[in-house]
Amino acid sequence: MSRVKRGNVARKRRKKVLKLAKGFRGSHSRLFRTANQQVMKALRNAYRDRRKRKRDFRRLWITRINAAARQQGISYSQLTGQLKKANILLNRKMLAQLAVLDPVAFAKVVETAKG
């Protein structure tokens, strides 16, 4: 049986983890064992929060549309139903942008939906 030398592989793996941990505080960026734990935790959080961001933005858009719609005397749920009936195909992101940046145009969209 020949001898297997793995020093380079281990060093490369540890350097990769420490490179990912750059910017972490204290031993979390210097010691391999703690850095490895923190990198795994950071990657897990990043994976989870990439999905959470989509939910958060959708909630923000709905809140903004609801606030702007109530100023026009209609609730969010009524507005979405009437938009569907009027065959106005604006998604929540577009409606929220209109509500924030161009309230006059949003008011016209609401009036059109009310029909």
Curated annotation (Swiss-Prot):
UniProt KW keywords: Ribonucleoprotein, Ribosomal protein, RNA-binding, rRNA-binding
GO biological process assignments: ribosomal large subunit assembly; translation
GO MF terms held by the record: rRNA binding; structural constituent of ribosome
PROSITE patterns hit by this protein: RIBOSOMAL_L20
GO CC terms in record: ribonucleoprotein complex; ribosome
Keyword hit for rRNA-binding: yes
Gene3D superfamilies the record matches: 6.10.160.10, Ribosomal protein L20
Keyword Zinc-finger: no
Domain of life: Bacteria
Free-text function comment from the UniProt entry: Binds directly to 23S ribosomal RNA and is necessary for the in vitro assembly process of the 50S ribosomal subunit. It is not involved in the protein synthesizing functions of that subunit.
UniProt xrefs under NCBIfam families: rplT_bact (TIGR01032)
Family membership noted in the UniProt record: Belongs to the bacterial ribosomal protein bL20 family.
Protein name: Large ribosomal subunit protein bL20
Protein species of origin: Microcystis aeruginosa (strain NIES-843 / IAM M-2473)
Gene name per UniProt: rplT
